[in-house]
Amino acid sequence: MATEKFETALKKLEEIVRRLEGGSLSLDESLKAFEEGVRHASFCSKKLDEAERRVEVLLKRKDGSFSREPFQPDE
């Protein structure tokens, strides 16, 4: 999964959720799908955390120049 892209992992996670919600999997199949889903969810979460750390916002100063500031999400 190290070379996998976020979008690919997210699509796989969405498919796993659809299969689990469908209710047609056996218990063993459900557990395997759940384990795979947890791996994809963890990967996606890590990628989102990395992206958030990289986001910078340009702020205009009073003198008209710009400065780069780390992204601070509103919580």
From Swiss-Prot:
Its EC number is 3.1.11.6. Its main location: cytoplasm. Coiled coil: none annotated. One of its GO terms (molecular function) is exodeoxyribonuclease VII activity. SUPFAM superfamilies: XseB-like (SSF116842). It catalyses: Exonucleolytic cleavage in either 5'- to 3'- or 3'- to 5'-direction to yield nucleoside 5'-phosphates. The keyword Lipid biosynthesis does not apply. InterPro entries: Exonuc_VII_S, Exonuc_VII_ssu_sf. It comes from the Bacteria. The keyword Hydrolase applies. One of its GO terms (cellular component) is exodeoxyribonuclease VII complex. It is an enzyme of class 3 (hydrolase). It is found in: Cytoplasm. Bidirectionally degrades single-stranded DNA into large acid-insoluble oligonucleotides, which are then degraded further into small acid-soluble oligonucleotides. Heterooligomer composed of large and small subunits. This is Exodeoxyribonuclease 7 small subunit. It comes from Pelobacter propionicus (strain DSM 2379 / NBRC 103807 / OttBd1).
